[in-house]
């Protein structure tokens, strides 16, 4: 592949197929298995399908996803978070959902929690008040607020950053990105609707992503 990277269709398909073991818990599809739409399969496949052939580790460590409301961002993010926490073969995985407010951070986490409760995953994953935990791997999925104080002890292997258009500074993003340094193949997954104005880290990441897509 380009620059030595390799596309693994099987690695991408494995994570896409994982979603079918999860179930919707809201609206008209509540109770139905999650079938990712083609554009969602592209997102998930792009994250997990590109690897370093020498190490087998993922190529991408950061993903920026900007979509209007109602496009299933939280569903995709919750499934990705569950995979990173409990199926990524990362010893002692720490995956966090974060936002400017804890209530916002809990949206993706609550979606993941409901997915566990409605699937066979609940047989191996403990559903707690404050997190999801798997004793056999010492892994967890947990929501956070945006207070960067006291986060120095975290060693995240995955972070879902929700609605980054509301972030006034890059403080939380920087702290979490730096904290992933000890992990083999960490992922920072930013999800957001479009914001207003060009202040804050969201515009910077939007602009950078646009240039990457256009090959600038």
Question: What role is predicted for each listed range?
Answer:
Residues 1-216:
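Phosphate/NTP-binding elements of NTP-utilizing enzymes
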């Amino acid at each position: 592949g380009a620059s030595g990277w390799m596309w693994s269709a099987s690695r991408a398909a494995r994570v896409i197929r994982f979603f079918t073991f999860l179930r919707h818990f809201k609206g008209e599809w509540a109770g139905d298995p999650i079938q990712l739409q083609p554009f969602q399969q592209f997102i998930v496949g792009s994250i997990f399908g590109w690897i370093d052939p020498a190490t087998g580790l993922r190529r991408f460590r950061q993903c920026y996803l900007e979509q209007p409301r109602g496009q299933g961002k939280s569903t995709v993010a919750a499934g990705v978070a569950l995979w990173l926490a409990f199926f990524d073969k990362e010893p002692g995985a720490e995956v966090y959902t974060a936002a400017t407010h804890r209530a916002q951070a809990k949206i993706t986490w609550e979606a993941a929690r409901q997915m566990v409760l409605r699937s066979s995953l609940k047989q191996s994953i403990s559903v707690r008040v404050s997190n999801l935990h798997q004793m056999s791997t010492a892994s967890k999925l947990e929501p956070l607020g945006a207070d960067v104080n006291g986060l120095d002890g975290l060693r995240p292997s995955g972070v879902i950053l929700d609605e980054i258009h509301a972030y006034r500074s890059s403080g939380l993003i920087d702290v979490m990105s730096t904290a992933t340094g000890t992990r083999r193949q960490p992922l920072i997954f930013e999800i957001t609707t479009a914001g207003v104005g060009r202040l804050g880290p969201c515009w910077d990441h939007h602009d950078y992503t646009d240039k990457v897509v256009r090959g600038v």
